[in-house]
Amino acid sequence: MSIRNIGIMAHIDAGKTTTTERIIYYTGKSHKIGDVDSGNTITDWMPQEQERGITISSAAITCHWKDCQINIIDTPGHVDFTAEVERSLRVLDGGVVIFSAVDGIQAQTETVWKQSEKYEIPRLAYINKMDRLGANFFKVVGDIENKFKTIPLILQIPIGNESNFEGVVDIILNKELHFAMENGIPKLTYSPIREEFAEKVGFFKKKLIDILSQFSEEITQLFLEDKEISLDIIKSEIRRGTISRFIIPVLMGTSLKNIGIEPLIDSIVDYLPSPFEKNFSAFSLDANKKILVNPNENKKLSALVFKVQYSSVIAAHLYFVRVYSGEINSSKKIFNASNGKREKFTKIFRVFSNKNEQIDCVKTGDIGAVLGLKFSFTGDTLVEENNNVLLESVTFPEPVVLMSVEPERSSDEVRLREIFGIISKEDPTFSYYESKETGQLIISGMGELHLEIILTRIKDEFNLNVYTGKPQVSYRESAGKIVKEVFEFNNIFAGKNIDFKIGMIIKPLPRGEGNKIDFECDINPTIKSAIFRGITTAFVSGVFGYPIIDINVGIFSIVSETSKISESAFESISGFAFHSIFQKSDPIKLEPIMLLEIRTPIEHTGEIISKFNVMGGVIHSVSNIGEYDLIKSEAAFEKLFGYASILRSSTKGRGSFTMEFSYFKEKVG
């Protein structure tokens, strides 16, 4: 059976979950249609999701259409949960990007588009909410072309618009598609194209052939010879153009009213790639270089852990895996190539949102979940022994908001730490630590909503009440200048007198470069590894108590007058040395700058811009969508606490905004 691993991506409220619920219904996986407003969707199964009507965790669903197995991941649209999108995209072969026919391209749409570009994911575009006031299919298509510098391939034209939208004309099939409820069951019917649509269909059919002929010699030849271009050839070339990311097929519908779903599922099967149509990149530990590997069931196992999810029912973590070669089964001896630990699968599951069906194996190209892993995390590579490859891992954005947390009862502090450990294992953008100054437990995340959801989980899922402080900005720090020095340690460590010198040079790097450690002298590999760990650990907290970023540390000399220094001593002393030298680099504090997209009624635009300027924000652009203006801007994160209340007050509750982290900037004053 053929497989499609696809993601459903969009801005919040564009209709991701509603569309996914319809796909689940039409493929026969569910006998009722879940509704976001009613809180009974299959994919949004967490209590916090059903209560808020948003997707928080990327739910995995397996369903079938015709002769194809479709693994669907419905991803969050809120920027606070962008890590869920990132780790899902890493294992997808194709995607459906949903656009609102009214709002067009929105902030998170741009974010997920960029993320999917990074992973070179072929996509379909589905323009939803065609029945809404202000819906404009062709404007959104134009925006996709201009904003994303891609070639949209229109496969359908609308029958009616806004409240009169009733179906589509399929340009390839030359048929009208109508969608109606019959005895309470959605039913698709086909009819010949009416004369009123003939000219428009002819125009877009010619445009479709023109686009395909740009990369298809076969279609070009048939066109020049004035021969018929068969349906099979057209669909085959659309598929080829989609997989090569030369084109983006565009469909439409209104998912809430069950219009456009079956053609969308057909297009997922017809145009998006199977796992066997693309080689995957890996790092060969034997050859010490990147390689391309062909997916093959007969090869040894290589799989990626792309998500870890805690189940309070079984009090254990469930590990979601994508298999790139070989197969997962409980008899295999497994090795975690990322950390060198041996692992074992105890149970294997086919996933259906929050419900699991136990199975015997997960084969090449498929997605499943396993129990039994003890030392694995998101982004780790699982292999059979002697298959020395590392798959490309998953990278995540920096947390930008902090909050102090303490249990109502001091006796619960150990349990609270355990809960934080459980959550941080499943959510790489959540972290916690103990403040050196106050002794308080500090949690950090992607935004206020992110931390709010986690605190709700602690109360509802783990039955623990906590006190919290006000949200604070998660600053960073970096070196202000180059400093070069030899640090001398002559003291007792672990009961032994140690005389040790280490020379370091610390240089500031451009923003976004990350931290680098270079060894400019010959060092024993064991000592080198210990020093690397010591300095890396020291990056966690600098002079101001914040993580250190964007510096280069060069080790240019090591002199030891003491024999047989332990690894732990090298590790600890290297950390001391780094902190001592870093203090002399004129450290600077960095604050997060956020990108905002503010949606406001036109009559309030002037007031919104004025107040935003007073806050020290910068306006990048203002564009109009019907009765609303979209203001794209940026501001320091510390100025944005409480901005939702300011916006609601200024717009009489009609305004809204989204924001995402952009970059770190030196904080002045």
UniProtKB/Swiss-Prot annotation:
One of its GO terms (molecular function) is translation elongation factor activity. It is found in: Cytoplasm. GO terms for biological process: ribosome disassembly. It comes from the Bacteria. Residues 1-276 form the tr-type G domain. Pfam families: EF-G_D2 (PF22042), EFG_C (PF00679), EFG_III (PF14492), EFG_IV (PF03764), GTP_EFTU (PF00009). The keyword DNA repair does not apply. Disulfide bonds: none annotated. One of its GO terms (cellular component) is cytoplasm. GTP binds at residues 10-17, 74-78, 128-131. Keywords: Cytoplasm, Elongation factor, GTP-binding, Nucleotide-binding, Protein biosynthesis. Belongs to the TRAFAC class translation factor GTPase superfamily. Classic translation factor GTPase family. EF-G/EF-2 subfamily. Catalyzes the GTP-dependent ribosomal translocation step during translation elongation. During this step, the ribosome changes from the pre-translocational (PRE) to the post-translocational (POST) state as the newly formed A-site-bound peptidyl-tRNA and P-site-bound deacylated tRNA move to the P and E sites, respectively. Catalyzes the coordinated movement of the two tRNA molecules, the mRNA and conformational changes in the ribosome. This is Elongation factor G 2. It comes from Borrelia garinii subsp. bavariensis (strain ATCC BAA-2496 / DSM 23469 / PBi) (Borreliella bavariensis). The lineage of its organism: Bacteria, Pseudomonadati, Spirochaetota, Spirochaetia, Spirochaetales. The gene is fusA2.
